[in-house]
Amino acid sequence: DNEKDNILQYNVNVGEKLSADFQKLLKPPHCLEWEKMFYPFIIFSKKRYVGNLYEHDVKKFKQKSMGIVLKRRDNANIVKIIYGGLINIILNKQDITESLKFLDESLNKLANGEYPLEELIVTKTLRGFYKNPLQIAHKVLADRMKKRDPGSAPQSNDRVPYVYIQVKETKKKKLLQGNKIEDPKYLIQNNLTPDYGHYITNQIMKPCLQLYSMVLEDLKGYKHKNDKKIWQNKYKILLEDKKDKIKVDDKIKQLREKEVEELLFSKYINKIENKKSGIKSMTDFLI
């Protein structure tokens, strides 16, 4: 900690000195002022980052993020608990292994339905008019609630709380998103089951894939550890084919994220799907 504080203090001192030196060259009202620094700092892409922000006091910092899921209101709190939790571990302990253990334990807990229902609630504002109301899930739910009980149904500008629920869906009969969500009170009263898989695949998984794809080579079970140039070679092959660096960069990201999904998420997705289908795993038979 002392070494880290010394490094941070050095950066503050240099920044403040440069600010003072530049000020001699600038005419008022121009001012080049030392402002802040991040350590550690995770950059996902332009205007998408998270890190610990320091200003003048190296003993004080606050976590600051931009453009990532922790800033979005249309996610359930479970995203902040799991994704926010592993971000905290990485930033404050700089321990990827511990963050992976936390992720594994959290996904297992979620797959087993061990989190309180309130952590799964999503809320969205109900507008007075929608061009395509059947495509707006919480509008479909609000209309359904109005049919059940007009007196307690959400009104325009209300925040509508809902939970994703397990529903039977076939290839022939695809359900609207509005038929896959339900009012939390109604869910409890009618003993409905939350769709834990949806929270994993549609809210938690994507940001985690983006994060861990940066350290794919360090993940347990990664199958190309002995081939140090595999991604470099894939990049060359794709670039020869597509002739577009941006498209190739995107494709490499997708491929790396797919490998992370297989390593970290596939067993939980399979576990939930098997539960829905009534298929038991070998561990269910162990006493």
Residue ranges and their predicted role:
Residues 1-287:
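DNA-dependent DNA polymerase catalytic subunits
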